[in-house]
């Protein structure tokens, strides 16, 4: 460099001496520190001074001497700034060639010149080493392509969708840029390959390549340590690594030497790998490790035929196909195939991002994400499309897989609404918006929609928490229904006015269950009465099973003082049309009927013919049903008296009184209801009692069993106490109250109802095959009133088939009084009728 600036005294004479020397040679010396800044570029010299040359001088810097020819018109300093403006930089100045050109010379000390020459020599040596190394890699790569194992090159590209990449570790003296350039990718192949740069082996997946390269770390460390200890750079072998027929490096056997070491220290592993000298405790681990050197993969997936070197890896991989995910996140509930995925997933909740990009400082959760991200900086695209003529590259295998669908036409995503197929998931999501709107996830339970899948899954879990509560409520409701059904016979006045067939609650269900509404909790009498009054007009017409086919309702309704438009339907008769299998009749005429209906009881046709101006018509069932079922017989008991007797027995004398005219009107209706059967000659019939009846009962027997005076007296005495008003009878309505037995045994209840009920229904298509219904007996009837085609449905088994009245009524006479036994009694020699259907009027409500 230059002399010291502090020695100004010694430097001043030198400046004078230099000026004198330069003046003699026609050169002028300028001090830039004392001259203006713009004096760096010297103005054009006059023609007369063109022979003189000016020199630019920087104080405390190197001196640059510039000479010009006399023919040049302008002086221009073209030296690079590091050579003239800085004091520490050392450049590689090369004087330009040419006689007429400018000549630059850098004034340097001998030490600086020697240092510069050493750096140049070192740089040239490094370049030569790098070039030789690159030539060795390329030569070995060509040989490897020719001798590659057939099982690796012919494998399907989908078996291991990973990139082919040859990684080379830079030698100690190489610059960092050399390591980047040395990553030579193998030319296009059907399957990406990863090649070990030390032994020349190729692998179809990145994980196998990484595992294999680790096996060389021990030998590599030893060689590097030996080379550094000797002080000599490790020589780079230019010879290619030889491979055998199996594609393995020459010198590596197919199987390891499984023999414990002779001199092993206590606690050390006795089994050593003969390739990398790594030791293991058991031979199985040595065999598994040795596959990283040989590349053997004996375990194959039966689903996708992917090969694995470790059996445990195959077991974990198989869970992808079997959808088994035993490792579950405690935070969000997501499950994974193996513990490693769960461990990486937990970083999402903890916020840990341990992998950081050295270029842009971006962080990642997984190391694979960082590797893919680094390719955006390096521009590497190792995943090439194998389709001829395409040649597109991608940074990750997933992008290549999606791109390949453009060539194969695969559309793996399906719309569950219109069944259209799509090749991309994001296109399917956009399509589903057309069906669902922006909220394209729909709950399968309540049809609520959500914007994303997580919200829908959380919502469905809420439904799962509600299931036990619903089951508890259903159990409580069923218990309440059974309790109310069991206690309904004890207090029939609390149930409102309904059909007497309601008592058969436990009969086998042959009618549709939807026709019977579940019973609600008990309400006060006033509210139940109002509900009964409001529900009457909405009742459906009676089916042919009702008593309207046996009674003569037109005569009774026209002769009665109340209006003929009175509703005779019970409260719960909505399902009457669906209960034609019942053996118990409602004994009520229909309010709204049809003009083409005819009575099913042929004995009543004469009475119908005498009243051509009747206001009540009847509905005729389909002929197919009439031909298959027997016709009804005569009435056996008056349900009104049964209800009157039960009410009189259960209620005390403190009830409210009702007006006498309403009581008389209701009693008169019931008496006229019975008088309609007086057209046929009556026979001698004993009074209602527990004694057996006469063997043959006719339809007209009912008229002789009732005394008008006694009947009216009984009704007036008991209905005066408010019972009639509570049953809706004080305003002209005369429905027959419901009769329910107090017996807890449903079998006894069915037998009593079969004995006292009317057999007037046609067979329903929903005929039950219950053995209990077939074993029920019913009272004798006048079979001669049926058509000839109907009689074949009845089997006469003689006079020995008597049904005991005590067994038929049982304890049920406590609720029905003596009238129950009247309808149930069968004298000796009565005909035994086997019922072919189930009592269903209990389910009609």
Swiss-Prot record:
It comes from the Eukaryota. PROSITE patterns: ZINC_FINGER_C2H2_1, ZINC_FINGER_C2H2_2. InterPro entries: Znf_C2H2_sf (IPR036236), Znf_C2H2_type (IPR013087). One of its GO terms (molecular function) is DNA-binding transcription factor activity. Residues 141-164, 469-610, 757-845 are annotated as: Disordered. The keyword DNA-binding applies. GO terms for cellular component: cytosol; nucleus. Residues 474-491, 498-508, 532-559, 759-775, 810-823 have a biased composition (Low complexity). A zinc finger (C2H2-type) spans 194-216, 271-293, 299-321, 327-349, 355-377, 383-407, 413-435, 441-463. The keyword Oxidoreductase does not apply. Keywords: Developmental protein, DNA-binding, Metal-binding, Repeat, Zinc, Zinc-finger. Plays a general role in the hierarchies of gene expression leading to metamorphosis. Belongs to the krueppel C2H2-type zinc-finger protein family. PANTHER family: ZINC FINGER AND SCAN DOMAIN-CONTAINING (PTHR23226), ZINC FINGER PROTEIN 112-LIKE PROTEIN (PTHR23226:SF371). This is Krueppel homolog 1.
